[in-house]
Design a protein with these regions (language model features):
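N-terminal secretory signal peptides
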Residues: 1-13, 17, 24-30
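Short, intrinsically disordered low-complexity segments
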Residues: 8-15, 19, 37, 204, ...
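Intrinsically disordered, low-complexity segments enriched in polar/charged small residues
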Residues: 17-21, 25, 184, 420
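Acidic/polar surface patches and capping/hinge elements
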Residues: 40-481
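C-terminal segment of classical bacterial N-terminal signal peptides
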Residues: 30-36
Length: 481
């Protein structure tokens, strides 16, 4: 098989539905070559084979496998019966909420809300979302590894008086609870990433998520305790990686390039310090050599090629349509929004819900997409601070920019690069949507020209660069879900 594929189950996801406006179709720049399969298939008693994704933090799925569980006790069954008797509209709503997107999506929503509230810059937001979803992915993979090793029957099978609520997978072991493992991993990572948020508040969400497994009659308390412990242990691996990924480096303030043709603070804010100048040296997840992927330099300032690029920006901004302005504002992902990476995760979320993906599939889609964008940010910022390219407004201060130009070098476009990476990954997983996803990426990169922030070459090279990065992420993964 040449692509990583998911069944679409019906109509394709309209980009107008997802983005509220469309753009003319475009073609993919490449087809994925065959990718060697490294899937592990788990077959629980009475169940069907499960294609298990790769781990990103653990060396193997069984690295942190918990010890075998004891037999469930009568006391555990009685506890579930008592909780069942107390079910209400409130508990039923909580059960439904924490089961959305197979138990993964609520934590994506929590993270995106934190990105908005704390006003994380796009690069930091992309890094945070990758750490979170890598941890969730590994927690799910490890939980399913343990389920395969230790089969434990559902409480409702052991005690028919228990009426399980929510999704039921016959033949799947309840030990450990994958939902609790997700909660343990996600809460541990989010506490590290967002110290502004109180530990108690995030831990309360983890407890709420885990408790719904009991309220629904889906798991024994020992399943939940084991899942939380497993998830928290994996979350600590993500924290350790985050502490060593180079993101705590401080810039010494020295400029490689200065003078005409190089980035300088731009009107109207004239922010003196460029954003995240060290991000190009952060550790990547799937790209083995950032410098080897670095694009060639842009046209030199003042040359005919550069003048043609600047004229293209003048023309685009002068002829900007209301729809193009709307697109530029949508894709901007400015401070106080979910960020550009968050926009692509919202697209992924809608596709996950449309196709009703299971827990393993959902965790995998979000991890691959987030990791591709995090690596794309690093590679893009490596190019930005290698070339220190001037922004278009430095060549023509009369440009009609839509809002203030971002405070960092122009070449290449971060929006174009991460959009190319995200669309390549999602298009590889959802091949029937690849054309629509590519069109979204093209619109995202064009939006930066329409806003007056980037030359066409910034966007075109960035998009191609991102597609290459997305392909590398897919090549690290398996061929089927």
């Amino acid at each position: 098989m040449g692509v990583i594929e998911l069944s679409s189950r019906g109509a394709r996801c309209s980009r107008r539905t997802l983005l509220r406006y469309g753009v003319a179709g475009s073609t993919l720049f490449y087809a994925f070559p065959p990718i060697a399969s490294r899937a592990v298939h788990a077959t629980p008693p009475g169940g069907t084979a499960i294609a298990r994704p790769h781990t990103w933090l653990l060396a193997s799925a069984n690295q942190l496998r918990p010890p075998p569980p004891a037999a469930p006790t009568r006391g555990e069954l009685d506890e579930l019966l008592r909780m069942q008797a107390l079910r209400s509209a409130v508990t039923n709503a909580a059960i439904a909420h924490w089961n959305e997107g197979a138990g993964v999506l609520p934590w994506t929503t929590v993270a995106l809300d934190l990105v908005k509230r704390t006003r994380r810059n796009p690069v930091r937001a992309g890094r945070a979302l990758a750490l979170l979803h890598a941890a969730i992915n590994d927690a799910v993979v490890a939980a399913f590894d343990a389920k395969e090793a230790y089969f434990r029957e559902r409480p409702a099978v052991v005690e028919p008086a228990i009426l399980q609520q929510g999704p039921i997978t016959p033949g799947l072991s309840t030990f450990p609870s994958e939902q609790a493992a997700i909660a343990g991993a996600a809460s541990t990572v989010l506490i590290h990433l967002f110290p502004e948020e109180t530990i108690e508040r995030i831990n309360a969400r983890a407890s709420d998520a885990a408790n719904t497994c009991l309220q629904a009659g889906a798991n024994y308390r020992s399943d939940v305790a084991a899942g939380l412990a497993l998830g928290r242990a994996i979350g600590k691996y993500a924290v350790t990686r985050g502490e060593a990924d180079g993101s705590n480096q401080e810039w010494d303030g020295k400029r490689v390039h200065t003078g005409e043709g190089y980035w300088a603070p731009t009107p109207p804010r004239y922010i003196p310090y460029p954003l995240e100048p060290m991000a190009g040296s952060w550790h990547t997840w799937a790209v083995p050599d950032v410098a080897a992927l670095r694009p060639p330099p842009p046209p030199a300032w003042g040359t005919p090629a550069w003048l043609a690029e600047l004229d293209a920006v003048r023309q685009a901004t002068a002829k900007r349509t209301p729809e193009q302005a709307t697109a530029a504002l949508f894709w901007a992902g400015n401070d106080g929004t979910v960020s550009p990476a968050g926009i692509w995760l919202e697209i992924a979320r809608d596709m996950i819900k449309r196709d009703r993906l299971n827990t393993l599939q959902t965790a995998r889609v979000l991890a691959l997409t987030s990791i591709a964008m995090a690596d794309a940010f690093v590679c893009c910022w490596d190019a930005k601070y290698t070339y220190w390219s001037a922004r278009p407004i430095q060549g023509d201060v009369t440009l009609d920019v839509l809002f203030p130009t971002p405070p960092f070098p122009s070449y290449t476009s971060g929006h174009a690069t991460i959009s190319g990476a995200a669309a390549a990954v999602l298009g590889g997983i959802f091949p029937s949507d690849a054309h629509d996803l590519d069109a979204r990426a093209v619109e995202a990169k064009n939006s930066r020209l329409w806003a007056g922030f980037h030359y066409p070459i910034d966007n075109d090279v960035g998009l191609a660069h991102g597609r290459q990065i997305g392909r590398l992420v897919l090549e690290r993964e398996t061929t089927t879900l």
